[in-house]
Amino acid sequence: MAYSTIDDPTNFFRIKLYNGNNNAQNIAWDETDTNMQPDLLWIKTRSGNTVFNHVIGNAISGGDKYLHPNTTAAETSNANVIHTFNSNGFSIGGATFVSEGARTYVAWGWKANGSGSSNSNGNISSTVSVDQSAGCSIVSYTGTGSAATIGHGLGAIPKFIINKSKADGEHWGTYHEGLGNGKALALNLHDGAGTNSSYWNNTTPTDSVWSVGTSPLTNDNSASVAFLFAEKKGYSKFGTYSGNNNADGPFVYLGFRPTWVLIKDGGSGQHWHLVDSKRDVGNDGDAQQLSPNTDDSEAEVKSNRGTLPLDLLSNGFKVRTDGSSCNGTGSFVYAAFAESPIVNSESIPNNAR
């Protein structure tokens, strides 16, 4: 049996670095093939002292609509931000969030299945855009404020879920298998995980639905969107590691060379850390990091919270700091996506880093 069914992760996830110019732009992926529409697109300013929010758009909501993952703001319509999702990339307007002149930007894009289709597996009907082979599902639904289930279409158990009411004022509820079904994080906050049965109704997701309780963090009585990820060997992994509070930090085995890693201390008020291989190409002990819960640029993250010695290796990642934000004495959760599996479907190893 093949180690992984995904030989080329860029068929399902890509990263693009680009420069703003105060104008609308068509942004093409660096890869030469033209068959990876980013149905989930996340953009962040990398540079500058005047800070700009993160931006997330998705194909169900459609172009011209976006959310800010570092705030509680409502979904906004504006053609000058994310405009279209294209087969070889995406188009943007000239807004500061995505194309301020003399700024650098990073975009992360996941493939699902376009504008989606209806799903009635749960108590709450949903519209689902899903790619089962890559374990990525975008779900649009209307929350009820009462305990319920919602269909996701993955055909596998999601291990990482991020949801947001499209209305103003609600946080980004975040489920991670490593925390269990009684806890939740908020993507837009540095707080540790909260414990409450009203988050996920004390129920672990199944291969067809996930459960929500009565908390507005996870089931606000409003139009909402959720992004769900199931683990795929050699392509994605959502796990935990224990910090050792030592400069020789833990090695986390993934089974692939990571291209994107998100880390959060599950127990205390530490910021989220997000690194990728396009912005950090050399394992030089100073990973270029961004925080989903702040609008800080890379330089501001470093100034405010110091360097992040994190090596992205051929089979996982290695923490090389005793900093409490990613290697204190507690438990940390992570989400990671692959640049390449350790071996492909023909048992050929990838190159070590």
Label every PLM stretch briefly.
Residues 1-353:
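Surface-exposed molecular-recognition determinants
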